[in-house]
Amino acid sequence: MDPTLAVGLISGTSLDGMDGALVEIAGSAQQPAVTTLATLALPYPAGLRGRLLHLAEGKPVPVAEVSALHRDVALAFADCALQLIEQAGFRCGQIACIGSHGQTVHHQPPADNAAGHTLQLGDGAWIAERTGVTTVGNFRTRDMAAGGQGAPLVPILDYLLLRDARRDRCIQNLGGIANVTYLRAGGGPEEVIAFDTGPANLLIDGTVQIALGEPFDRGGSLALQGTVDRDCLERWLADPYFRRPPPKSTGREYFGYARARRLAEESAHLPVADRVATVSELTVRSIERAYRDFLPRLPDEVFLCGGGARNGYIRARLGRLLAPARVAVSDEAGIDPDFKEAMAFALLAWLRCTGAPGNLPAVTGAGRAVPLGDVHPAG
C-alpha cells in the first residue's frame, strides 16, 4: 500500500489544550509503519477550557451550551489541524484522513449489567467541512456498543509499533489518568493487557492548583522536596478502584477535581511539598500495585509517555519500585512521549478508512473486534 498522510487530534482529561500529529502510514493494517512528520500543541481558545471544565465537573449546563460546545471544540480542532498541515508544508488535499478524538466530558464504563456511555465533544462534520479532509470521530461508542469499556484505545498503536520479540514491555501513559499496555515478548494481539491503573496528573495538578494556584508541579520539583505521609497514602490506596481487575477504565468523574479537593482537605495539616509528594506517590504506588496484581510478571522494559513522563519524581520512583525493569521515556523507542495519543488517533482513522477493526477485545472487554469511529467524507 502506498504511503498515506493522516492527522491525529486529541485533548486529554486534563483539558489543557489540543495535541496534533501529522504522520505517514505505510504497509498493511496488520503491520503498518507510522512515521511522525510534524506535531503541534495548542491551548484552547480563551474561555473554551473554562466552559469545558464546568461541564466535565458535573455542574448544571443547558443543553444549548452542550450543543454549542460540540461545535466550538470541533472548530478549535479544525484550526489545530489546519495550522499543523500548513506548518508542515503540506496542503489539505494531500491528507487522506483526520482522526479526531474530541474532548471527553463524560465516560461511564459498563457496570452492574448496565451498558456504558461516553461523550466526546467536537463534531467531526465541522472538522471535515472546515478542512476539506475526510474526518473520523466518535471512536469510543462503537466499542461500548460491542460490550467494551470504550477504553483504552491507544494500545493498538502500542501493539503494532512497540512490541518486541524478546522483551516484555509496558507502555505507561501518564496523562490525566494513568494507563498501561503490557506487551508480552512475541505475543499476539489477544495477549495484550491494557487498562487504566488510576490517576496520574489529574490529582497532582489539582493539589498544586488548590494549594498554590499554579497549573502543575513542573518536573516534579515540589514532590522531590517533600516527604510522603504514610497514613494519608495508605488510606488513599485503599480505594476500591485499585483492587478491581481489568478490563477497567476511569476518568475525571472519579479521579477529578472533586477528589483532589477531598484529598487536599484530608492532607491540609501537611506542608504543601509533602501534600504534593504524597499525591504523587499515590500515582506511583497505584501503578506498581497494578503491575504486581494484574500482569503475568514485571516487564523487562517500561516506556513512559504523556505529560507525566517529564516528572522527575514519578520517573525516579517507578525506576526504583519496578527494578530491575529498565524505565525510560518513550522517545528512546522512537515514539514522541507528548504526541503518542495523537499518533494513535491518526492510525485509528486510517484503520477505519481501510475497513479494519480498531479495538482490541482482550483489552476493552468488547465481544468482538469492530471498526471504530464515524466517518465524515471530504467534499
Curated annotation (Swiss-Prot):
Superkingdom classification of source: Bacteria
Molecular function per GO: ATP binding; kinase activity; phosphotransferase activity, alcohol group as acceptor
Biological process according to GO: 1,6-anhydro-N-acetyl-beta-muramic acid catabolic process; amino sugar metabolic process; peptidoglycan turnover
Coiled coil regions in record: none
EC number from the UniProt entry: 2.7.1.170
Alphabetical keyword list: ATP-binding, Carbohydrate metabolism, Kinase, Nucleotide-binding, Transferase
Pathway membership, UniProt: Amino-sugar metabolism; 1,6-anhydro-N-acetylmuramate degradation; Cell wall biogenesis; peptidoglycan recycling
CDD domains (alphabetical): ASKHA_NBD_ANMK
Binding residues for ATP: G12, T13, S14, L15, D16, G17, M18, D19
Reactions catalysed: 1,6-anhydro-N-acetyl-beta-muramate + ATP + H2O = N-acetyl-D-muramate 6-phosphate + ADP + H(+)
Its biological purpose: Catalyzes the specific phosphorylation of 1,6-anhydro-N-acetylmuramic acid (anhMurNAc) with the simultaneous cleavage of the 1,6-anhydro ring, generating MurNAc-6-P. Is required for the utilization of anhMurNAc either imported from the medium or derived from its own cell wall murein, and thus plays a role in cell wall recycling.
Family: Belongs to the anhydro-N-acetylmuramic acid kinase family.
NCBIfam families named in the record: PRK09585.3-2
Protein's name in the database: Anhydro-N-acetylmuramic acid kinase
Organism: Gloeobacter violaceus (strain ATCC 29082 / PCC 7421)
